[in-house]
C-alpha cells in the first residue's frame, strides 16, 4: 500500500509544525517551500487538517498555522484515516463477475486495519521529539 501524496504531504506538514519551537506559527508558504510542493495542493491539505482539528489557522497580520492540539495527542493512524481513501479495491463495479464470491475485499480490509492499528501506536511527538537530524534537515534548530 502506498499513501497518496495528499496524505504524505499532510503528514510532512504536521511533522514540520511539530518540529517548531513551542508557540511558533508558520505559514502555508513556508511549509510548501520546505518541501517544494504546490501551494494550491498544500492549501487543500491544510484545510482538511484544520477541519479535522489537527491544525489551527489564525487569520490576520500575526496569523499563520500551527498544530491544533499537542503533538503527543495526534495519533498517526487518525491522521491517515482522515486524509487517505482506504478502499483498496472497487467492488461496486458491474464489470467484476466474481464479486458475489470474492474474498479479496475482506482480506484487504483486514490488512488495512492491521496497518492502521500499527500506526495507532505512534503519535506525532514520537516522530519528532529529540530528533536532532530532523531539526537540522528542516532548519528549525
Swiss-Prot record:
Q: Which Pfam families match?
A: Rrf2
> Any binding details for the cofactor?
Binds 1 [2Fe-2S] cluster per subunit.
A single GO BP term for this record reads:
negative regulation of DNA-templated transcription
What is an example of a GO molecular function annotated in this UniProt entry?
2 iron, 2 sulfur cluster binding
Q: Which InterPro entries match?
A: Tscrpt_reg_Rrf2, Tscrpt_rep_HTH_NsrR, WH-like_DNA-bd_sf, WH_DNA-bd_sf
Q: Could you say which residues bind [2Fe-2S] cluster here?
A: 91, 96, 102
Q: Which domain of life is it from?
A: Bacteria
The Swiss-Prot or TrEMBL record marks DNA binding at 28-51
Q: Might you report a single GO cellular component term? A: cytosol
Disulfide links within the chain: none
Co-factor requirement: [2Fe-2S] cluster
Q: Any idea where the HTH rrf2-type domain is? A: 2-129
Which UniProt keywords are given for this protein, alphabetically ordered?
2Fe-2S, DNA-binding, Iron, Iron-sulfur, Metal-binding, Repressor, Transcription, Transcription regulation
- Output the PANTHER family linked to this UniProt entry: HTH-TYPE TRANSCRIPTIONAL REPRESSOR NSRR, WINGED HELIX-TURN-HELIX TRANSCRIPTIONAL REGULATOR, RRF2 FAMILY
Q: What does this protein do?
A: Nitric oxide-sensitive repressor of genes involved in protecting the cell against nitrosative stress. May require iron for activity.
| UniProt cross-references to HAMAP family, sorted A to Z | HTH_type_NsrR
Report what the protein is called: HTH-type transcriptional repressor NsrR
Lineage summary: Bacteria, Pseudomonadati, Pseudomonadota, Gammaproteobacteria, Enterobacterales
